[in-house]
Amino acid sequence: MGEKPGTRVFKKSSPNCKLTVYLGKRDFVDHLDKVDPVDGVVLVDPDYLKDRKVFVTLTCAFRYGREDLDVLGLSFRKDLFIATYQAFPPMPNPPRPPTRLQDRLLKKLGQHAHPFFFTIPQNLPCSVTLQPGPEDTGKACGVDFEIRAFCAKSIEEKSHKRNSVRLIIRKVQFAPETPGPQPSAETTRHFLMSDRRSLHLEASLDKELYYHGEPLNVNVHVTNNSAKTVKKIRVSVRQYADICLFSTAQYKCPVAQLEQDDQVSPSSTFCKVYTITPLLSDNREKRGLALDGQLKHEDTNLASSTIVKEGANKEVLGILVSYRVKVKLVVSRGGDVSVELPFVLMHPKPHDHITLPRPQSAPRETDVPVDTNLIEFDTNYATDDDIVFEDFARLRLKGMKDDDCDDQFC
């Protein structure tokens, strides 16, 4: 018989191994009408805890300047949301009962494990990182969500790295089930001294929604009734990042470009389908490019398009990402003619996003002894449960330097 699949649970311990945090996932989905709740468990060494309390915080922050520029008490960082949860001693009236995963973890880890729970507001931005330049140091700019667990006598007490756990989670969106209409655009250019004759450009995409890594098919149709000659046709994909903080500024960055020496003579027509694929691997040196995660990690890609709920307050949205295909005709002695086609670039909703149901089995009548060596979790009953523990750190690209505890995703 093969091994039955287990429920994956991510864990990370403090440097002194006295505190361990467990989460069922690292990415939390924004469904527009609701956001996945953050439910986890923190395990504490009781001998180390003594008379202190256990706090867990969730912070959404927007860093809009390099960390090495934080001088004279000025920080290029704005906290968009902060929530605190006292995991131990438990509050008299907890906000909600433990979830199913928390119940299973509490039974497995024993009496020194304590649940925590956060609700992410719907108006908070999704996680976006702006790609740093080759010479940039410190934390990258962008929006991130951090969970921090620590022991202290009060929430105001300063915590130390050695006895605290920091985890960067991501708030993500997946592609909608019903995509929008097929993008298309057209324009007509009249030239001076051309006897009212015109150059007509029409372009369209085969669909509106594309997944990361999927090629885009751009259909270009040119009707040249003018006396001008189209010398070249350029097709490019541009990423637009609207930075919404104190004021709104827009940055654009080409992520894929294609240039063909396709000429369209006067009084002729032309039709062709161009294929172009925007990939992060072709843009790893571009400073300020919006990404879904850290550049050093394997699951990183170009930032997904941001889907904004109708009526949302854009002032607290952080970074809004969108994409457009630009088709440009290079015309001899007459200026260029171009159109833009907006499209959506996202990940499909994974099939394993919903946790598989636990196999039906009769409940055990006898109590299972809990091992005292909880920090290492060398348990004797692993074969009786379907929980699989995995380190929280994400897989790195080969050759990337390890930043140890300062790494945002470790």
UniProtKB/Swiss-Prot annotation:
Expression sites (tissue/organ): Predominantly localized in neuronal tissues and in the spleen.
Keywords, alphabetical: Cell membrane, Coated pit, Cytoplasm, Cytoplasmic vesicle, Hydroxylation, Membrane, Nucleus, Phosphoprotein, Protein transport, Signal transduction inhibitor, Transport, Ubl conjugation
Sites bearing Phosphothreonine, chain numbering: T383
Annotated region (Interaction with AP2B1), positions in chain: 364-410
A single MF term (Gene Ontology): molecular adaptor activity
Region Interaction with TRAF6, annotated ranges: 241-410
Knocked-out gene: effects: Loss of beta-2 adrenergic receptor/ADRB2 ubiquitination. Reduction of dopamine-dependent behaviors, loss of Akt1 regulation by dopamine in the striatum and disruption of the dopamine-dependent interaction of Akt1 with its negative regulator, protein phosphatase 2A. Increased serum LDL-cholesterol levels upon high fat diet. Exacerbates insulin resistance. Elevated cytotoxicity of natural killer cells and lowered susceptibility to mouse cytomegalovirus infection.
Any one biological process term the GO annotation gives: negative regulation of canonical NF-kappaB signal transduction
Location of Phosphoserine modifications: S361
Matching InterPro entries: Arrestin (IPR000698), Arrestin-like_C (IPR014752), Arrestin-like_N (IPR011021), Arrestin_C-like (IPR011022), Arrestin_CS (IPR017864), Arrestin_N (IPR014753), Ig_E-set (IPR014756)
Function noted in UniProt: Functions in regulating agonist-mediated G-protein coupled receptor (GPCR) signaling by mediating both receptor desensitization and resensitization processes. During homologous desensitization, beta-arrestins bind to the GPRK-phosphorylated receptor and sterically preclude its coupling to the cognate G-protein; the binding appears to require additional receptor determinants exposed only in the active receptor conformation.
UniProt protein name: Beta-arrestin-2
Organism: Mus musculus (Mouse)
Name of the coding gene: Arrb2
